[in-house]
Amino acid sequence: EQVAQGKSSYLFKDFAHAPSKVAATAKAVSQQFRGLSCIGCLELHTYSSLDPAFLPNYKNSLNDLDEAIVFYDPEALKIKGRPVIATEDIKAAFGLAGLHVFTDPASLHRYLIDKNYDQSVLLMMSSGNYGGLNWELLSSKFA
């Protein structure tokens, strides 16, 4: 779903969270928007995606992107009765050098809002809410 579009930038929201869907969506966007920087932000919030034993299924799923971000809210782990997942474990599971991992909603929001999206596509992948992300404010970056 296209959320916003600027002169040379696009913001998309996709409900992808299964590893194969994440990989297919990232690949499709990077192929469709050649010449633009493709940035993907995946929120891990489903029961399976927050399972350390399941995380390796995401290996290479974000490799087609120019920049990849993974976010999970430790509150979601607490609610599901799961232990905190170390940032290093997430990076190792995805197998992507330079992967940005956020576990604090405010830090993620600040990072996304402060970013310059000229000549970029931002693909937000989750059926969650990124810890209460202000979509209106983020969309304004693409006007």
Put a short name on every predicted segment.
Residues E1-A143:
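ATP-dependent carboxylate-amine ligase
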